């Protein structure tokens, strides 16, 4: 497993809207006798779906400043495909601590590792933790199959304040599943709005 990198220093606070994309890794192969769960790779279907997801995000001009991923092979592979498909040059962190982590650990990683001059972060993780955070922030029960991406916006002044509290709840903007926009279901257009690139 890779070692946990040093925590980045924080810059001055910003009032800009923060965008957080939470993704469950794409479909992975079953565990083989000679390998551990940590080493499981994506299936061909998982690779294809991730590439479709990257294309959808890219077509909407989504901007990503930082990628935070579990250090497991299937999450790193998912993050690699998203970065390549979106032609990203974002900062990248693969963290052992996020392997099968609970929801609060993903939330803490967003708060602890994002820099204040960054406006968007993309997080790739596992269930039940990543689904738990998506449902907690969305304040509703949602199905989170593999390769689901939930796009949230936060008006928090700093990344440290992004976590959900009684006075602050990140807003669910869009849900992508199977490489396509699954929510909201817009009756007037086939192309629901996603946060645009600044």
Residue ranges of predicted features:
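Extreme N-terminus of proteins, especially the signal/transit-peptide cleavage junction
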Residues: 6-18
């Amino acid at each position: 497993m890779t070692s946990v990198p040093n925590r980045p220093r924080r810059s001055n606070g910003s009032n800009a809207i923060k965008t957080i994309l939470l993704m469950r890794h794409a479909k992975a192969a079953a565990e083989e006798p000679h390998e551990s769960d940590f080493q499981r790779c994506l299936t061909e279907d998982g690779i294809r779906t991730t590439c479709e997801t990257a294309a959808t995000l890219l077509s909407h001009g989504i901007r990503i400043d930082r990628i935070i991923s579990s250090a497991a092979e299937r999450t790193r592979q998912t993050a690699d495909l998203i970065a390549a498909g979106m032609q990203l040059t974002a900062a990248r962190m693969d963290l052992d601590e996020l392997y099968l982590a609970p929801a609060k650990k993903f939330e803490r990683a967003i708060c602890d590792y994002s820099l204040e001059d960054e406006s968007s972060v993309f997080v790739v993780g596992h269930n039940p933790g990543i689904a738990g955070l998506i449902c907690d922030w969305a304040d509703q029960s949602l199905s989170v199959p593999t390769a689901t991406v939930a796009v949230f916006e936060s008006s928090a002044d700093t990344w440290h304040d992004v976590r959900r509290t009684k006075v602050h709840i990140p807003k669910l903007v869009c849900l992508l599943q199977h490489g396509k926009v699954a929510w909201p279901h817009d009756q007037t257009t086939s192309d629901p709005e996603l946060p645009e690139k600044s």
